[in-house]
């Protein structure tokens, strides 16, 4: 099995807001993410794990559409996506209504859940933030459902 893992991409951030280079830096972050997707297309990992803060704030509908278009370029890779403490799910979040490509598994809840992948004999556990901060140690009580499988 091969997987890629990224976190804290912070798409949509405006580094050094007000400076002449701010917009270019913001675009550089999007370009870097698109380049990472191209690497995934070349390397064909089984999984792309995105463990929070793909966005710097609540994603706009057009931003999610752009990301979905990028994910659709790697249909051979299962994308597992969690919302983090910057892009946490709110009542009006477009995360809740996004129509993800078939290869995307989004963790919609703030309680640990899992996705099973029989072809890879793998189970992936995760959760999304629904608040800026989670104070409980939610993973402390999580134990693999099946120890004969690969559990991530």
Task: Locate predicted features.
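His/Asp/Glu-rich metal-coordinating catalytic cores
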Residues: 47, 57-152
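N-terminal active-site segment of His-dependent metallophosphoesterases
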Residues: 1-66
């Amino acid at each position: 099995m091969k997987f890629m893992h990224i976190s804290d991409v912070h798409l949509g951030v405006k580094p050094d807001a007000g400076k002449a280079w701010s917009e270019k830096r913001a675009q550089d972050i999007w370009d870097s993410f698109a380049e990472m997707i191209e690497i995934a297309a070349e390397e064909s990992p089984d999984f792309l794990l995105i463990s929070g803060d793909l966005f710097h704030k609540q994603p706009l509908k057009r931003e999610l559409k752009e990301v979905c278009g990028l994910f659709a370029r790697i249909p051979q890779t299962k994308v597992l996506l969690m919302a983090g403490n910057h892009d946490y799910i709110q009542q009006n979040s477009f995360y809740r209504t996004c129509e993800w490509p078939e290869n995307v598994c989004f963790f919609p809840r703030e309680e640990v859940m899992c996705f099973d992948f029989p072809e890879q004999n793998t189970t992936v556990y995760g959760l999304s933030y629904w608040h800026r901060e989670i104070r409980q140690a939610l993973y402390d009580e999580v134990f693999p459902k099946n120890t004969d499988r690969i559990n991530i």
